[in-house]
């Protein structure tokens, strides 16, 4: 192709491209003109719609609709003309029927919300939530979860179907988290001129000028000169009466039981007919929940009642009767469990006396060192197994029971404990692990922290599709341990020690007990067959062994047991509830025990184990004591406060232990932190921990928690466990932080009422 041809084609191509560009530009110009016309037309139409609708068309409509505006308007319209209707009247019952054996029977019942009465039903459950949570609620995550759970529970109580429950709960949440007419009227009243005038009048009275100023302002007033005369003669000036909050440190004397009844031929009584030596219970009542505690004196009257009612007799229909005995052959039925326990636990040998002594610290170590030394000079004797009985220095709640039977402690001699401890002290932990394996997971909650216990409960809970927990314990477990029960327990030990004759002789001393109890004003001498003697080396081990194996024998279903002596929680499927409840009480009675089963619970936080409940802190589970009980009980001390320094040392010890156990937990964290702040820089007294070697101090031994921010999930879980709403938690924490504990010991006074809301009767 030549050069001329290329030039011709180039000219033609340029002409065509230019033409196309011109056509495109013309088309864009035409479309722009049309767009301007359309825009102007829409503007005119929009202006016409705005004018004709009065501006209502400017409100953006949600694609999902906005029915809650009508709900709120309906509440405002009905607020002054409320017709009382129960939620059941606002729902419709639907019965699902089926034919069984030729007959039509009702298989299930459910309720649906009547669509014509939906708004009234929603307002009804919203009002219940308002009343429960205390009006206007802060919009926190914890409150959102708590209110949602509460509303869902109200729908479940009426058996509302899930779809309608979701619809009604979402609508009711709007009403709960917005102020209603009552709250608006209340705030309007508080902000009114009349209310302001009252506040000014009160402030003017409380802030009165001094008597000298009043005399200068009113020199002709006779009352002012009379007031001056009174002041000159040593009287106080005329001031408004104020009512300061009570609260401080004081002590209470020990108490005597007022009940004397019964007697037993095996008990020799010697009444000294003189006043008893009184114990003291020290109290701080600046921060408390209202429960009052006392301590029993170690006196003849208390010792007598404690022995008769906690060792020899049980109460039935307000009469003292002998303890029930197990059915003949009942413990022989459990021979297969003893053999299984032996296979899992294995054989063991006793440890040396020095190894046993090394297991203890402080004063108890010294006692056992001396006992071990005496055994080198003189072998164990029968009298070493005799009991030395005394009244336990224990705080008891007078609000729950004003005059309970005192608890007795019945230890044997340290020489006997050393000999038996050489067999059972180290063996005890192997026995617990064997019980764990028999039950298929951690079962005996000895030696665990509160977090570990809660985690074990959570793991057991998650092993079931529809879990339910049934708590149960045996009324006065130790008292109901019969000779047959002791013989079965001892046979488990002897199997693991290959029938050791010396161990058999030591255990035989527990079958027939000889004891004496000395008080400051009398004494008692007695003989008792069987019965667990609190103070024996094998008290905890024996109780756990019996509780775990008897329950395993009774429960022929898939289940998990959480145990700590006589305190038990059984977790299983909901379909097995009837089987468990019917077999627990009747089954345990065959072994001579009085089993008390609690109501089944279906939520983790509702479980009660050792007077604690599981609470989720946002990262994991931990066991938390009921604040209503713990904050009052930890306000009472069995350690003497001889001076202000001793009181501060006790406050610091309790506060630090409490923070290690309950750091990051609502309310109680601030309670223990206040103890630490009140103690200041006082030096710790390690003797206090030894004197107060209770479960509280032992729980804190391995705990590692501390003061930290409370998570929203923890507030919600705490509400689930104890019923204290998140807003109430925050309010109480602020109140605790504002209070001051006076560490000067003074006369007894009434407790401060700042934490009244924790009392269950107000909830």
Swiss-Prot record:
Domain spans labelled RdRp catalytic: 467-580
Stretches of the chain forming a coiled coil according to its record: none
Top EC category: transferase
BP-aspect Gene Ontology terms: viral RNA genome replication
Top-rank lineage group of the source organism: Viruses
Keyword flag tRNA processing: no
Catalytic function, reaction form: RNA(n) + a ribonucleoside 5'-triphosphate = RNA(n+1) + diphosphate
Keywords noted in UniProt: Nucleotide-binding, Nucleotidyltransferase, RNA suppression of termination, RNA-directed RNA polymerase, Transferase, Viral RNA replication
EC number(s) on file: 2.7.7.48
Gene Ontology molecular functions: nucleotide binding; RNA binding; RNA-directed RNA polymerase activity
Function, in words: RNA-dependent RNA polymerase that plays an essential role in the virus replication.
Other observations noted: Readthrough of the terminator UAG occurs at position 246.
Protein name: Probable RNA-directed RNA polymerase
Organism: Carnation mottle virus (isolate China/Shanghai)
């Amino acid at each position: 192709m030549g050069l001329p041809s290329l030039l011709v084609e180039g000219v033609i191509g340029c002409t065509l491209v230019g033409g196309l560009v011109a056509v495109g530009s013309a088309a864009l110009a035409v479309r722009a003109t049309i767009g301007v016309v359309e825009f102007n037309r829409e503007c005119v139409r929009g202006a016409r719609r705005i004018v004709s609708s009065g501006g209502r068309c400017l409100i953006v409509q949600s694609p999902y609709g906005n029915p809650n505006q009508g709900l709120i308007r309906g509440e405002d319209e009905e607020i002054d003309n409320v017709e009382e209707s129960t939620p059941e009247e606002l729902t419709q019952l639907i019965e699902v029927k089926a034919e069984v054996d030729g007959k039509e029977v009702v298989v299930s019942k459910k309720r649906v919300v009547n669509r014509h009465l939906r708004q009234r039903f929603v307002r009804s459950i919203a009002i219940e939530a308002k009343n429960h949570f205390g009006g206007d609620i802060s919009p926190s995550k914890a409150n959102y979860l708590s209110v949602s759970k509460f509303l869902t529970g109200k729908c479940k109580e009426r058996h509302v179907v899930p779809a309608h429950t979701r619809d009604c709960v979402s609508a009711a949440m709007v009403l709960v988290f917005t102020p209603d007419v009552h709250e608006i009227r209340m705030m309007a009243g508080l902000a009114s001129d009349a209310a302001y005038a009252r506040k000014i009048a009160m402030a003017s009275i409380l802030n009165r000028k001094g008597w000298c100023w009043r005399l200068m302002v009113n020199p002709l007033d006779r009352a002012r000169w009379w007031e001056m005369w009174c002041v000159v003669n040593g009287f106080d000036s005329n001031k408004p009466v104020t009512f300061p909050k009570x609260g401080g440190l004081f002590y209470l004397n020990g108490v005597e039981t007022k009940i004397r009844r019964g007697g037993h031929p095996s008990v020799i009584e010697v009444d000294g007919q003189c006043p008893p030596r009184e114990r003291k219970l020290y109290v701080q009542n600046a921060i408390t929940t209202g429960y009052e505690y006392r301590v029993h004196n170690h006196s003849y009257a208390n010792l007598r009642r404690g022995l008769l009612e906690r060792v020899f007799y049980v109460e039935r229909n307000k009469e003292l009767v002998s303890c029930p005995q197990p059915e003949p052959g009942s413990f022989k039925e459990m021979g297969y469990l003893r053999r299984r326990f032996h296979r899992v636990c294995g054989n063991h040998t006793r440890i040396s006396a020095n190894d046993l002594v090394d297991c203890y610290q402080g004063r108890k170590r010294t006692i056992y060192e001396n006992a071990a030394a005496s055994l080198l000079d003189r072998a164990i004797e029968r009298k070493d197994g005799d009991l030395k009985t005394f009244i336990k220095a224990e705080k008891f709640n007078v609000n729950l029971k004003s005059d309970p039977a005192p608890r007795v402690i019945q230890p044997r001699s340290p020489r006997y404990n050393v000999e038996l401890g050489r067999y059972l002290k180290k063996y005890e932990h192997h026995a617990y692990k064997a019980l764990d394996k028999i039950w298929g997971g951690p079962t005996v909650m000895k030696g665990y922290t509160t977090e570990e216990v809660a985690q074990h409960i959570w793991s057991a809970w998650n092993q079931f599709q529809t879990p339910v927990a049934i708590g149960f314990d045996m009324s006065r477990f130790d008292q109901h341990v019969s000779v047959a029960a002791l013989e079965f327990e001892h046979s488990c030990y002897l199997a693991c020690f290959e029938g050791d004759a010396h161990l058999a002789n030591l255990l035989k001393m527990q079958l027939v007990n000889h004891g004496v109890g000395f008080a400051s004003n009398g004494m008692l001498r007695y003989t008792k067959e069987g019965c667990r003697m609190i103070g024996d080396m094998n008290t905890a081990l024996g109780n756990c062994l019996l509780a775990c194996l008897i329950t395993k024998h009774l429960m022929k279903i898939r289940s998990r047991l959480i145990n700590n002596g006589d305190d038990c929680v059984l977790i299983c499927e909901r379909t097995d509830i009837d089987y468990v409840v019917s077999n627990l009480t009747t089954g345990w009675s065959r072994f001579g025990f009085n089993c008390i089963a609690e109501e089944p619970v279906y939520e983790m936080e509702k479980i009660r184990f050792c007077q604690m409940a599981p609470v989720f802190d946002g990262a994991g589970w931990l066991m938390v004591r009921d604040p209503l009980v713990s904050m009052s009980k930890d306000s009472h001390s069995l350690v003497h406060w001889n001076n202000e320094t001793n009181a501060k040392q006790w406050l610091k010890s309790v506060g630090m232990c409490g923070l290690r156990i309950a750091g990051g937990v609502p309310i109680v964290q601030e309670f223990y932190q206040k103890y630490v702040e009140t103690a200041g820089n006082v030096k710790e007294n390690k003797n206090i921990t030894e004197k107060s070697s209770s479960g509280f101090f032992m729980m804190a031994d391995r705990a590692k928690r501390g003061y930290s921010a409370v998570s929203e999930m923890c507030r919600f879980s705490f509400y689930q466990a104890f019923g204290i709403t998140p807003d109430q938690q925050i309010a109480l924490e602020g109140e605790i932080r504002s209070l001051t504990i006076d560490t000067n010991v003074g006369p007894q006074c009434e407790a401060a009422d700042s934490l009244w809301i924790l009392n269950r009767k107000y909830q």
